[in-house]
């Protein structure tokens, strides 16, 4: 079986297509026409494990700070993330704010997310449910540019993130989605598979590709709609 055949067969699975439909409008567009397209941002690919640096959302694991869900240690204020006067410890907070076109939603998330020193995952789910009708109609289009913006902010604020990114060397960062069930994981990350006796990570790995580019260029390019706001104000420049 060729690699491209494997990818096409995986995407023929209706369950996977349904999962990917939550993050991309056209699942067919994810299929590469050649192995040379694996590096394109929104293309599925097979990435040899020996060329990858996997990371997961678990404190104490290697490259932990590369994950959007990673927490800056409590009290390490020099590495806290800052958007204007909003100070927070987890990049995912800023990322999911951009999903909703509502200052009320942004303030609710800011004021309700933190429970003591931990981020309450239940509040994230409540946020998406409470304000679902206010989700940006173009979210599937703008989400990767918004992620680039968020990563730029994290790179500027967090030395732990810069350290882990540099430690990857020339290898490809991969958000390891093996064994996870989140619908978007094979878009942002990739899972461990075996094809023709060789181990690969399979997925779009959009986050990993953005990180690889940021390691090289420091600042990721992005283009956001003029009507995209946070807290009722225009997005701050980075």
Predicted feature descriptions by range:
Residues 2-238:
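Charged, low-complexity intrinsically disordered segments
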């Amino acid at each position: 079986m060729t690699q491209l055949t494997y990818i096409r067969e995986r995407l023929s699975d209706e369950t996977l297509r349904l999962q990917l439909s939550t993050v991309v409008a056209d699942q067919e567009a994810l299929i590469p026409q050649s192995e040379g397209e694996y590096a394109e941002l929104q293309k599925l690919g097979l990435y040899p494990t020996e060329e990858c640096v996997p990371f997961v959302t678990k404190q104490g694991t290697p490259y932990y700070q590369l994950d959007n869900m990673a927490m800056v240690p409590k009290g390490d204020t020099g590495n806290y993330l800052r958007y204007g006067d909003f100070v927070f410890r987890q990049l995912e907070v800023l990322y999911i704010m951009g999903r909703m076109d509502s200052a009320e939603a942004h303030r609710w998330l800011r004021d309700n997310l933190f429970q003591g020193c931990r981020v309450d995952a239940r509040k994230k789910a409540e946020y998406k449910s409470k304000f679902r009708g206010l989700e940006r109609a173009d979210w599937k289009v703008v989400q990767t540019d918004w992620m680039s913006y968020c990563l730029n902010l994290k790179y500027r604020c967090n030395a732990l993130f810069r350290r882990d990114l540099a430690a990857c060397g020339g290898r490809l960062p991969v958000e390891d989605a093996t064994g996870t069930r989140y619908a978007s994981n094979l878009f942002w990350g990739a899972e461990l598979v075996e094809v023709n006796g060789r181990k690969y990570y399979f997925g779009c790995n959009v986050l990993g590709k953005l990180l690889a580019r940021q390691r090289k260029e420091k600042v990721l390019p992005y283009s956001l709609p003029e009507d995209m706001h946070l807290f009722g104000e225009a997005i701050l420049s980075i």
